[in-house]
Amino acid sequence: MTENQNVYDITIIGGGPTGLFTAFYGGMRQASVKIIESLPQLGGQLSALYPEKYIYDVAGFPKVRAQELVDNLKEQMKKFDPTICLEEAVETLEKQADGVFKLVTNKQTHYSKSVIITAGNGAFQPRRLELDGAQKFEKKNLHYFVDDMNKFARKRVVVFGGGDSAVDWTLMLEPIAEQVTIIHRRDKFRAHEHSVENLINSRADIKTPYVPVELIGEEQIEQVVLQHVKTEEKVVIDVDDVIVNYGFVSSLGPIKNWGLNIQKNSIVVNSKMETNIPGIYAAGDVCTYEGKVKLIACGFGEAPTAVNNAKAYFDPSAKLQPMHSSSMF
């Protein structure tokens, strides 16, 4: 039972673009809303993987930078001040005898009248740097995410990786850092050709094909030892910060154990965006139905459907069809 517990109207699992818009819309329906996100920042893959890439298929935007879209969604959502829980992964989800959902994460327990899952392709975690002692530098000056570029101003930054994320972060940091060095184990980068061209024409130091073999430092990383893949020549670089962009591993993980109808790694929903468990809804890339198309734009359309039906679920007196937003503010 959930007496004396703080029970939210809607708890959203996943803080990507669909989750952020779901939170805004839930607030607009005068619901108390909580977002639980496994990453240390909101924005999902847009923020973590390609913040500087342009998106061209969001209605009303001829083009919009991924991080700009996330920032706008966060600003829109702030109007209703939802509760945000970062670096929390939901491990179990169950409906109690009183109908309230109990969500247990790696940090705490949450209670909610309804749940909307907007987890994209599932919780995803970075591929970590597999060097002795690397873990002790995490949350110091070894980074897998960048939430504020300004903290790298006038610093010597090393970026590991050869894909879009690594090249994007190098280009973004190049104007503000004292020096940016990008390290890739292959001769050629996997990033978009235009981005690679910009990288070559920037003042960033490019070292290929090299791999890191040692991190030197006590409290923080002070030097990185690199080894040439072919000649095995070693180079030592002085650093202030290290950013690792080796990609991410995503998985539905514990979601598969919650009793939901899952087909081809997606949660099956009906026209209400409702799962096979009443009170649990899904929207965005994590869900599937006949004719489903996995696009951000589609997730934005599914979010209001999920919220309005969730509202009617936990408050049967509420109207399913809301007022138009132009009449509300």
UniProtKB/Swiss-Prot annotation:
Its EC number is 1.18.1.2. The keyword Oxidoreductase applies. FAD binds at T18, E37, Q45, Y50, V90, F124, D285, S326. SUPFAM superfamilies: FAD/NAD(P)-binding domain. It catalyses: 2 reduced [2Fe-2S]-[ferredoxin] + NADP(+) + H(+) = 2 oxidized [2Fe-2S]-[ferredoxin] + NADPH. Gene3D superfamilies: FAD/NAD(P)-binding domain. Signal peptide: none annotated. Transmembrane segments: none annotated. Its cofactor is FAD. GO terms for molecular function: ferredoxin-NADP+ reductase activity; flavin adenine dinucleotide binding; NADP binding. Binds 1 FAD per subunit. It comes from the Bacteria. Keywords: FAD, Flavoprotein, NADP, Oxidoreductase. HAMAP family: FENR2. Homodimer. Belongs to the ferredoxin--NADP reductase type 2 family. This is Ferredoxin--NADP reductase 2.
